[in-house]
């Protein structure tokens, strides 16, 4: 979808660039596939802030997305394309031929009225879901399962995709947008195409308040705090902290490696860096 640039009627609109959503559904989500969510503001059950920079934001309804696509061999028709406040990509409401409704991530170039299916016998068309075993090498895919049957976890945000590089010994190698190459079981499923809303990376919020609507609070520098609040705090006048960069809890930061090895790390063929 094209970008929408506003005239500078006010200072807050001067820098705003948004994605044009005029072609999306303008009504409310399907009631049986939506539920309310409560905001915590980053607090735990004791009322203490455990996640910094989280605010309330605008009230939202959570759309229950089908990441598994486990309704096999039944065609579905795309009823409408909707905006989802909980994610960067758009979502599609689909109606199966047996009358059931479901929300899925909307791939790029998926239109209202298109027919899609989750089947290993399906054609390689945008929106169809197949196992990696039957998807041809070189195909662009998204919503990829790490563990078969768990549901898609890779390439779900706006404009993202992965490329199927090759298959060998029960595993497929996929290349992610970050440059990382991973081995995934051939029994895992993925959806053909790239995720919608590719222009999301080009938006500009234009003012701090628009970011607050998303539930994000301001980020304060440690050197601007008092010593009781941060190791970099205090000092006479403006100071540079006087020590190597650390977190509020005294651990080294800015270059300190924090990633811990997981069981799935063994499936990384090539690191993103």
Curated annotation (Swiss-Prot):
Region of interest called Disordered, as start-end residue ranges on this chain: 224-260
Function: One of the primary rRNA binding proteins. Required for association of the 30S and 50S subunits to form the 70S ribosome, for tRNA binding and peptide bond formation. It has been suggested to have peptidyltransferase activity; this is somewhat controversial. Makes several contacts with the 16S rRNA in the 70S ribosome.
Top-level taxonomy: Bacteria, Pseudomonadati, Pseudomonadota, Alphaproteobacteria, Rickettsiales
Compositional bias annotation for Basic residues: 251-260
Assembly and binders: Part of the 50S ribosomal subunit. Forms a bridge to the 30S subunit in the 70S ribosome.
Similarity comment: family membership: Belongs to the universal ribosomal protein uL2 family.
Single biological process term from Gene Ontology: translation
Signal peptide: none
Entry GO terms, CC: large ribosomal subunit
Identification of the protein by name: Large ribosomal subunit protein uL2
Entry-linked SUPFAM superfamilies: Nucleic acid-binding proteins, Translation proteins SH3-like domain
InterPro entries: NA-bd_OB-fold (IPR012340), Rib_uL2_dom2 (IPR014722), Ribosomal_uL2 (IPR002171), Ribosomal_uL2_bac/org-type (IPR005880), Ribosomal_uL2_C (IPR022669), Ribosomal_uL2_CS (IPR022671), Ribosomal_uL2_dom3 (IPR014726), Ribosomal_uL2_RNA-bd_dom (IPR022666)
Organism, scientific name: Orientia tsutsugamushi (strain Boryong)
Alphabetized Gene3D superfamilies for the sequence: 2.30.30.30, Nucleic acid-binding proteins (2.40.50.140), Ribosomal protein L2, domain 3 (4.10.950.10)
Keyword field: Ribonucleoprotein, Ribosomal protein, RNA-binding, rRNA-binding
Superkingdom to which the source organism belongs: Bacteria
Single GO term (MF): rRNA binding
């Amino acid at each position: 979808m094209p970008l929408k640039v506003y005239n500078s009627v006010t200072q807050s609109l001067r820098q705003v660039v948004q994605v044009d959503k005029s072609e999306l559904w303008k009504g409310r989500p399907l009631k049986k596939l939506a539920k309310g969510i409560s905001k915590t503001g980053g607090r735990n059950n004791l009322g203490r802030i455990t996640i910094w920079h989280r605010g309330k934001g605008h009230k939202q309804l959570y759309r229950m997305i089908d990441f598994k696509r486990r309704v096999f061999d039944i065609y579905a028709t795309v009823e409408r394309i909707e905006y989802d406040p909980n994610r960067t990509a758009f979502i599609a409401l689909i109606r199966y031929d047996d009358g059931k409704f479901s929300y899925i991530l909307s791939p790029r170039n998926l239109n209202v009225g298109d027919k899609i299916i989750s089947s290993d016998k399906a054609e390689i068309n945008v929106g169809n879901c197949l196992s990696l075993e039957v998807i041809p090498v070189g195909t662009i895919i998204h919503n990829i399962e790490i563990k078969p049957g768990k549901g898609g976890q890779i390439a779900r945000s706006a404009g993202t995709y992965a490329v199927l590089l090759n298959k060998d010994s029960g595993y497929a190698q996929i290349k992610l947008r970050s440059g990382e190459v991973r081995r995934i079981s051939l029994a895992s499923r993925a959806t053909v195409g790239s995720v919608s809303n590719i222009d999301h990376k080009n938006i500009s919020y234009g003012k701090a308040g628009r970011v607050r609507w998303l539930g994000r609070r301001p980020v304060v520098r440690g050197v601007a705090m008092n010593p009781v609040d941060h190791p970099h705090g205090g000092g006479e006048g403006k100071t540079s902290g006087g020590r190597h960069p650390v977190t509020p809890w005294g651990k080294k930061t800015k270059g300190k490696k924090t990633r811990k090895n997981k069981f799935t790390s063994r499936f990384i063929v090539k690191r993103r860096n």
